């Protein structure tokens, strides 16, 4: 498909220029010259009511049955095609409400966008029919967001379907949708959705301006758009929410956020993003207030546990062992006496091995990933401990840290980096280094803003009404 858009971009001015075509023969030659490198481009001649007409489309991207039954067949039976042509077509074909008029020199772009272009001899406009094939994937529960309670619908790779899933939940004329065509060759549709009167109009304007300024060859996923709209691109903390569930996107819209839906991607982007969204989950709203609050506290504790546990272990073992009870200290010394590596190097090796196994299990096929996890966790870990290369307390610490990291799955990358940073500074300065890095981290998070919204809101600064959720 990229070669098609390349042809359109290169030949559109050469073939069409600013002149109206003379007849259908000339138009067909120009179109065939424009798409000369694409074997799937098709032209079809048709006489309608005494007028010479032409269809142009990309084979494989349109529903030929709909084209034949609902467009071509009614036009063949049309006795007279008169001006205004749009009204005549609307009175003839079944897809009357989906006819769009474009200038003839812009018609190759519409054809490359998987639509059907219809030309009438002597007319300087093209009439566009949207007859794309229906989505190949049915709406179902997204694999990354399975739930025990709640809606199980998920976004798919078709933008119109995704927008309708949101509109099904927010039936209001104040739900605004702005569309953009992004990508020099791909011309990918990006939909910006927000609720008028709830979302901040300044953020909407700023985000719209960022999208309009995107200059790239193509957009094939929402992650491409995200890389252009981030306020701080070098931060390892995520700055935008992502979801595959229309109910989550709708809930965030009702809270005043903005959603971006990209054609071809099942993942919607929500902005502005706050760090405390990481501990929120749709299942919380099916629990009582106290229970949901406790669950979120456990998630926050799990995140802190993940980041700090290896650093605290190294600090206690290396610098502050006098803080440990005597029996615990003797047990720890007995387990680590014959290990050939210093504690910090040992912990670094175990953490690195875990990250390698984790990345390998993610990228391997599902069934092999399970086998790899068993081999890595049981065989390699047990063998390394029995051979005396690493100590059992180090394996236990890394295992506990690995469990806690998935309490905030959206921040797994940031948690992994912070865990290594805390480990390195604790190996040099002990608890003093942990405290210093914590102060720096809190100051850094306090300085972050996401489209003018503080990253630590509603706690810093404190916004009392927003604390209710």
For the regions a protein language model found, what residue spans apply to each?
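Positions that flank functional sites
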Residues: 185, 268, 372, 399, ...
